Amino acid sequence: MSEAAIAKKETLVQAAAEKFESAASVVIVDYRGLTVEEVTNLRKQLRDAGVEMKVIKNSILSRAAKKVGLDGLDEVFTGPTAVAFSNDDVVAPAKIIDEFAKDAKALEIKGGVIEGKVSSVEQITALAKLPNREGLLSMLLSVLQAPVRNVAYAVKAVAEKNEEVA
């Protein structure tokens, strides 16, 4: 192999390693059996959510993962592999791919990385079932508002009772 080819591959490994390091979550899928239209549709959905999907050679992915200390991913880097990287939303790639896989049976989640830790298929699908960030924040807000609301109702009830007595 020529020095230029080796340098090019090292550049690709470095770029993939940087993506692994900077990503909040990574979902690794086998896209074998999907039509071009399905892959295009999946890429569009992911792009709309701020997620980048790339098809990268398994050998480059394996070296990049080892370079950033992500051991245990070698078994998922077999066959046709696409990788979805999300820098902001941890849940988005898992949720979109899991939903898409319900319609496109050929799409198979192989594994992933959540906040720098190697994750199994089960962990990725469990993550996909969580509400998105806005949903979680609204749940938290309603939980925080409940005690204040209850105190307000109690004060109102006491005030109404005092008015009836007077």
UniProtKB/Swiss-Prot annotation:
The encoding gene: rplJ
Protein name: Large ribosomal subunit protein uL10
InterPro entries for the chain: Ribosomal_uL10, Ribosomal_uL10-like_sf, Ribosomal_uL10_bac, Ribosomal_uL10_bac_type
Keyword Ribonucleoprotein in record: yes
Protein family per UniProt: Belongs to the universal ribosomal protein uL10 family.
Function noted in UniProt: Forms part of the ribosomal stalk, playing a central role in the interaction of the ribosome with GTP-bound translation factors.
Short name of one Pfam family: Ribosomal_L10
One GO molecular-function entry: large ribosomal subunit rRNA binding
